[in-house]
Regions:
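Noncatalytic, solvent-exposed loop/strand surfaces
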Residues: 106-507
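Short, flexible, surface-exposed loop segments at domain boundaries
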Residues: 2-61, 65-110
């Protein structure tokens, strides 16, 4: 097993504000329609309602990346997702292409969903809760049972400092947040060896009795990484070296106050926009241009509620695409195009801490929170309005999150692992399993992490609890293990404060 200690101080990169160049180039998103490598040209079908096609000239010096690997125009194939940076004459300087792979679960039943992670390979986990923000990995060929001692360790990294951030993984880098001294720090490691790559200061450390440091997980988008600290410090940095592109404090800019246990949101990237929830008087939820940090819109939700501890999701299987998230006392839906508030419901919200990220399938949204509150299912109409289908106390989920597979919700109802039928809200089975914790799914299995340490593997089936492996996490900190487990690239990642443990779980 490889191991190392992350030394942040020598790695922190000086702030570099990029101004020149932003207005001289544009970024285009779409799907490859035609490639003429002999003529150095590529044509893509543009995303969005406007659609259309656009042709680019690709000079010999242009950078071409396919699934994170350096390639040439001759390797590009029709159907790949494409992100192209080009000048005003349509001369491309950078092409980032990805093979589209369907993210399958065990098929779909009524109310089920096969995640659509177009353009993201199984070896990537670029944000909180994975490509679709649903904690469902696209990995296949994984161990379906573990030896008594657990899976084989791959590498370990220490020196990450305090915090509950999990990891984001893309282009061979593992990126998380931690602390050094009085600073919150963004940190990158090599995904194969764990070797330290770089560190960048985010802001000052927030201290409280439940554990100091950051709570959110970074979001990687193409060649940039975005992260939000516990004091509201928002950072955009280059993913290769950690050079800072822009930064701001969202609480100061939008008139928000920090929440009891610190800002915990993991920001969402959707096209050109970064979505976050400052919970301020000048914007409950906001969209910022991801390249510059400038405000695109600020959503004035009634009552100007503070932020919650949840993170937003995209719901586009309705009349108009919207963002859904928790705020302090309710669940809200906001129109993606302009930030117009569409609906607000408090059936599954509490006034203490709403932590779990919502789930969705089609026009249904499932939410749950702790502190005795419970869960709710909402149906979104063609006008985007959310209507309550049911609410009950079958899933009182604190902050371990839930997964939705084939029409069934799996998650921890306080101390008990449950399987709930999404359509009815009724419990199919329950088991004490590892006790209160978090859950991730991959290859037909549930990966269960107790906040007290044990890790277990069980089948993701509504037929009953079938545990096929368990081990005790070594190097336990004195804090609850609240960072969600991640399955990516044939490995299981477990962050516990100062330490990141990585295990081989490929067959």
């Amino acid at each position: 097993m490889l191991s190392g200690e992350f030394r942040f101080r020598s790695l922190i990169v000086a702030t570099v504000v990029l101004v020149g160049g932003v207005a001289l180039a544009a970024t285009y998103y779409g799907t490859v329609e035609e490639v003429a490598s002999d003529a150095n040209e590529i044509t893509i079908k543009l995303n969005g309602k406007a659609g259309g096609v656009k042709k680019f000239t690709v000079p010999m010096e242009a950078q071409v990346l396919i699934d994170g690997k350096k390639s040439g125009l001759a390797d590009v194939e029709v159907g790949q997702s494409a992100t192209i940076v080009a000048d005003g004459s349509n001369n491309a300087s950078r092409l980032t292409l990805k093979n589209v792979k369907a993210a399958g679960t065990k098929g779909t039943k009524a109310g089920g969903r096969s995640p659509d992670a177009a353009g993201v390979s199984a070896g990537e986990w670029p944000q909180h809760r994975g490509p679709n923000r649903d904690n469902v990995s696209m990995e296949k060929g994984l161990l379906d049972k573990w030896p008594a001692a657990g899976p084989k360790p791959a590498w370990k990294q220490t020196g990450l400092g305090m915090g509950y951030s999990s990891v984001a993984i893309s282009d061979g880098r593992v990126i998380t947040m931690g602390t050094t001294g009085s600073d919150e720090v963004l940190a990158a490691m090599n995904a194969v060896t764990g070797k330290q790559l770089w560190g960048a200061r985010v802001g000052r450390v927030r201290k409280d009795g439940t554990g100091d440091g950051p709570r959110g997980t970074p979001t990687i988008d193409e060649d940039r990484v975005y992260t939000l600290g516990a004091n509201g410090d928002l950072l955009c940095a280059k993913a290769d070296k950690g050079n800072v592109v822009w930064q701001k404090n969202i609480l100061e800019e939008f008139g928000g106050g920090n929440i009891t246990w610190g800002i915990s949101e993991s920001v969402l990237i959707d096209g050109d926009n970064l979505i976050c929830t400052p919970g301020g008087k000048r914007g409950t939820m906001v969209a910022l241009n991801k390249l510059t940090g400038k405000t695109v819109w600020a959503s004035p939700v009634e009552g100007a509620p503070q932020a919650a501890y949840s993170s937003p999701i995209i719901v586009k299987d309705v009349g108009e695409k919207q963002y859904v998230t928790y705020v302090h006392t309710s669940v809200i839906g906001v129109r993606a195009s302009d930030g117009k508030p569409l609906w607000k419901q408090n059936a599954s919200a509490n006034g203490t801490a709403n932590c779990s990220t919502p789930l969705h399938t089609g026009n249904k949204v499932f939410t749950a929170s702790g502190y005795g509150t419970g869960c709710a299912l909402f149906e979104l109409g063609s006008d985007g309005e959310g209507t309550l289908v049911y609410s009950n106390k079958e899933m009182v989920n604190h902050h371990g999150g839930m997964v939705l597979l084939d029409g069934y919700v799996y998650g921890f109802d306080e101390q008990i692992l449950k399987c709930i039928d999404l359509a009815t809200g009724k419990t199919k089975w329950q088991n004490r399993s590892v006790g209160k914790g978090s859950v991730t799914s991959a290859d037909g299995q549930l990966y269960l992490r107790s906040e007290n340490g044990p890790i277990a593997l069980c089948a993701a089936t509504p037929d009953g609890y079938e545990e096929t492996g368990r081990f005790e996490q070594p190097n336990r900190s004195d804090k609850p293990a609240w960072s969600h487990p991640v399955v990516c690239g044939g490995k299981l990642y477990l962050r516990d404060q100062d330490t990141l443990l990585v295990y081989d779980i490929k067959k």
